Amino acid sequence: MVVAVMAPAAVAQVGYEPTEENLQAREAFRDSGFGIFIHWGVSSMLGRGEWVLNRDDVTLDEYERLAASFYPSRFDADAWARAFKASGAEYITFTTRHHDGFSMFATEQSPYNIVDGTPYGRDVLKELSQACARHGLKLHLYYSHLDWRRDDYVPLGRTGHDPGRRSDGRWSDYLAFMNAQLTELLTGYGPIGAIWFDGLWDRDEQPGGMDAELWQLPQQYAMIHRLQPACLIGNNHHVTPYAGEDMQIFERDKPGENTAGLSGQAVSALPLETCQTMNDSWGYRITDDNYKSSDELIRYLVGTAGRDANLLLNVGPRPDGTLPEKAVKRLADIGAWMQTYGATVKGVRGGPVAPHEWGVTTHRGRTMYVHVISDSTDDAILLPYTAAKPVKACMYDSREAVPFTVTPAGIVLRLPAAAVPDRVVELTFKTNI
C-alpha cells in the first residue's frame, strides 16, 4: 500500500481578509464536529417535504393559504435544545426562510411570516435562540437566496414556475429585501455562528446566473461580517467557495465524494461541513419512514470527521412542532455513542491518513484515532502511515492493549472482535502528528 496523506486543495479568497475573530470562530467550528439541521415551516402541514410548492400540484395561491392554519401548538424550544444537546451536537442550523419565501421569524420586510401571517403569532426563532443559549448550543441560520413567491426574484431560474406567479418586479428590490432581513437576523437574535445560504444554483443554467456581482455577494458578505465579524458564511451553491465565504458545504456527500451528484467541486482549505438527512427528506414527509439506522448514522459521522468535516444532520419537525419519534431515537442513540467516543470526532482533525476501505483516522496532538467502521471481520488492518512509530496502541473504550507491528508499508494493528459500529484504536506517538 502507498501512504495516503490528506491534502485539501487551496481556494483563493481574493479581496477578503478574515478578522482574527473570524479565524478563531473557524477553528471553534471545526472543533464542534456535529450539528443539527432543522427544516421546518408551513410546508410541514402538507407532509410532502419542503419542495411541495415546486414539485406537487399545489398552486402558489393555495400554498399561501396554509399560513392561516399554521399553529404548532406543541412546539417547545427547550425540548428541542435538550434533545439536540444530548445527541452530542454543538450547534443547530435553523431554516429562517426556505425557497417558499415564508419567514420563520419576526420580520418587518414582509407580512408572510410566522408572527404576522399565522394564528400562532410567536417568534419561534427568538425562542430557539434563547433555548440554545440556555443549553450551550450555537445558533446558525439557514437563509435561501432563492424565492418561489416574490415577484422581484427575476428572472426566474429553473425552479418555482407556478402558473399564476408574477415576475415583473425589480431585482434590486429583492437584493435589498434579503439584506434587510439578514440585518434583522444578525441584530435581533444574539450571536450567530454562521449564515448558511442556499439556492444560488437555481440560476446555474443562465449565462452569468451565479456570478457574485449579479447577486452582490461581496456587498452582502461584507455586511454580514461587519454586523458580526465572528459569523461564518457558507453557501450551498455546489461550486468552489467564493471570496468572503468562511466554510465549504457539501450536500448529501462527504468531502471528496459525489454520489448524489451535487458535490463534484474541489475540497478547499476552509472548514468543511457535510449536510445529510436521517431518512430521505429534509422537510417533514409523512410517508418517509426510510430512516437510516443509528449505526449507519454513527458511521457517517465518523466518516465525515475522518475527512476533516463536520456533520450537519437533518431533522424535519412535524407541523405541530414535535420531532418525529424515530428522529428522537436516532439522536438519543448518537448521544449514547458520543458519551464514550465523542472526543474522537470532536476537537480533532481529519487524517493524517486518507480514508480507506476499513475506515478513517482522526487526530489531536500526539494521538491518532483509528476508526474501523467496515463490516469486515478481519482481525488485522494495515494503517499506511510511515511518518512515525507509535509508542502505544490500545482500544479507546476498554484501554485493552492492541498488538501492532511496524512494517515498511505502515502499521499492522491486530484488533479484538467487537459488535460495535466503530472500533476505535488509540495510537500514541512521541510527538505531535
Regions found by a protein language model. Give the residues of each.
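Sec-dependent signal peptide recognition
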Residues: M1-V2
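Mature catalytic domains of secreted/periplasmic carbohydrate-active enzymes
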Residues: Q13-I433
